[in-house]
């Protein structure tokens, strides 16, 4: 066990001293039990150890999960420094330890359907004839819905956060390479994500027909791709400029799909789908994660269902 390197790794990801101490302690107990070198440890070894904690030490799932977290950190450290080719803790999770309510994870097809339904209902077939609005209010509402369709498209296809969507600039779009730059921040890296073919037309329409009209409502010239309207321009805080727009879009999506919660749910779905189609490393880049351990949290997990299959393929 590379204790010194492990501690340095955990310090680099800002874990608390007591947490580091616990992870070292639990990892030591694992190696004392399995009696193998780092590179020799396999998934069945981890599963067998977790079964030992359950059957011999009579530990509850919560404490077994703590051991698994420690081991996952250690093998992630070895994976990132190139010592091992695969983390044996990938896809493992103790059943019954997650107390958070699980929300729906959308498939790529379901995300596309969510966008199509929004576009048909609120853009293409939207009827405001029954609205007793002034003409300029109807124009603003139409512009907002066209803009929100583009926002939703970026959420669904690029997996961006709300803050990242605010920061996209005109120069971040490369039509020749069919890519868009997503600007990160303190916690996320910059990355270039491919544009889907269906997004090209949406972007062209927005840039040629919608954004110029939105620009008329701005007090200064802007390089931002997404522009706000008077209802949100009046806010005194820049970080609140799009809150009204995002909240309105959430409300509209909830009216379409009762299982829709928020945009974090969409991002979680997108990253989960990337892992399945692109692999863990590429998904890490596309999500903007600085550490592979962050991406690993999106892996589909269920330890108890895996044990029998692993036993059949890799006998202890």
Where are the model-predicted features located?
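Conserved catalytic core of the tyrosine transesterase superfamily
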Residues: 1-316
């Amino acid at each position: 066990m590379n204790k010194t390197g492990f501690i340095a790794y955990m310090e680099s990801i800002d874990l608390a001293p007591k947490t580091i101490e616990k992870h070292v302690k639990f990892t030591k107990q694992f190696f004392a039990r399995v009696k193998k070198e780092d590179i020799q440890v396999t998934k069945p070894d981890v599963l067998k150890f977790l079964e030992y904690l359950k059957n011999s030490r009579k530990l509850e799932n919560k404490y077994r999960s703590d051991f698994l977290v420690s081991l996952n950190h250690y093998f992630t450290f070895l994976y990132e420094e190139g010592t091992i080719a695969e983390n044996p803790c990938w896809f493992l999770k103790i059943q019954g330890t997650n107390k958070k309510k699980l929300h729906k994870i959308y498939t790529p097809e379901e995300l596309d359907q969510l966008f199509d339904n929004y576009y048909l209902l609120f853009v293409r077939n939207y009827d405001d004839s029954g609205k007793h609005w002034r003409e300029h209010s109807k124009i603003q509402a139409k512009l907002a819905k066209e803009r929100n369709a583009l926002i939703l498209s970026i959420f669904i296809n690029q997996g961006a956060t709300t803050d990242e969507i605010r920061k996209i600039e005109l120069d971040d779009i490369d039509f020749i390479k069919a890519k868009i730059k997503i600007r990160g921040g303190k916690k996320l890296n910059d990355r270039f994500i491919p544009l889907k073919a269906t997004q090209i037309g949406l972007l062209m329409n927005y840039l040629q027909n919608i954004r110029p009209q939105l620009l008329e409502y701005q007090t200064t010239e802007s390089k931002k791709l997404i522009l706000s309207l008077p209802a949100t321009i009046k806010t005194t805080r820049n970080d609140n400029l799009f809150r009204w727009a995002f909240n309105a879009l959430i409300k509209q999506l909830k009216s379409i799909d009762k299982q829709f919660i928020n945009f974090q749910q969409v991002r979680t779905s997108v990253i989960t789908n990337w892992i399945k189609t692109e692999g863990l490393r590429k998904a890490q880049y596309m999500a903007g994660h600085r550490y592979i351990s962050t991406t690993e949290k999106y892996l589909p997990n269920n330890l108890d269902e895996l044990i029998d299959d692993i036993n059949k393929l890799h006998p202890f």
